Amino acid sequence: MKDPKAPIGVFDSGVGGLTVLKALRRLLPREEFLYFGDTARVPYGGKPLAMVRRFAWEIAGFLLRQGVKAIVVACNTASSAALPDLAEDLSVPVFGVVEPAARAARGFRKVGLIGTQATVESGAYPRYVDLAWAKACPLFVPLVEEGLWDDPVALLVARHYLEDAPKDLEALILGCTHYPFLKGAIGAVLPGVALLDSAELTAQEVARALEAEGLLNPEGRGRTFHLVTGDPEAYRALAERLGERVEAVRRVSLEEL
C-alpha cells in the first residue's frame, strides 16, 4: 500500500519542468515534491532516444529509492522516449506531458508543433493529434538554461525557427517544458496563434489519478526539495530568476543513479 504522505517525484533535464511543478503545486498545495533536474546532462533534445531512455530509467529508479508515490516525467523528450515503458513497469503511477498537450490542441483546425529534435523525430505527438507543421528548435533549451529567455537574442532565434510556419496556423504546441519561458518571443513572431503547453493539463491528470487511488496527502506542508546533477548554486540562481523559491537543493552525483 502506497503512503499518501509520500512525496511526488518530478523530473526534467533542467529547469523546464518547473513549469509543470508550479501547476502541480497550485492544484495540490498539500503535497510534497522531489524535483530532479538532470542539469549535468542537459539538454536531452540532441541525444539519441536510447540514451534519453536510459537517463529516464536512472532518474526514475533513483526517485523510487527516495520513496515517491508517483512520478511526473516533466520533459517532452523523456516522455517521448520512455513513458510507455516506465508506466508499464514501475510500481507507482507515472505521468507524462505529451498526451495532455496534444489533447489541448484537438479543438483547433491547423496545429503546429515545436520541440527538441528528439521529440519531433520520435513521432510521439502525431499519435494523438494531426499536425500541419512541426519544427525542431534545438537552441531554445540552451537559451532558457543560460537565462536568456527575455534577451533580444531569444527573439532573433524565434524568428529564425518560426519564419516558415504556415500563415493560417491556429495553435502551436510548445512541445518542451522549457518553451513556456519563451512565450514572449514566440508570441511576438506568431501573434494570434494559441500557444499550448501541457503544465496545467498534466497537473489536472495527476490530481485526478491520485484522488481516484486515495493517494492525496491530507495534511502535508507543501514543501519542495530540489535535486540536481550539476552545480546546485547555479541551479538555484537560475530557478529563482524564473520565480522558483529554492529552499533546499542537493547535488546528486551520476554515480548515485
From Swiss-Prot:
SUPFAM superfamilies: Aspartate/glutamate racemase. Keywords: Cell shape, Cell wall biogenesis/degradation, Isomerase, Peptidoglycan synthesis. It catalyses: L-glutamate = D-glutamate. One of its GO terms (molecular function) is glutamate racemase activity. Pathway: Cell wall biogenesis; peptidoglycan biosynthesis. It comes from the Bacteria. PROSITE patterns: ASP_GLU_RACEMASE_1, ASP_GLU_RACEMASE_2. Transmembrane segments: none annotated. GO terms for biological process: cell wall organization; peptidoglycan biosynthetic process; regulation of cell shape. Substrate binds at D12, S13, Y44, G45, N76, T77, T177, H178. The active site is at C75 (proton donor/acceptor), C176 (proton donor/acceptor). Its EC number is 5.1.1.3. It holds the Pfam family Asp_Glu_race. Belongs to the aspartate/glutamate racemases family. HAMAP family: Glu_racemase (MF_00258). Provides the (R)-glutamate required for cell wall biosynthesis. This is Glutamate racemase. It comes from Thermus thermophilus (strain ATCC 27634 / DSM 579 / HB8). The gene is murI.
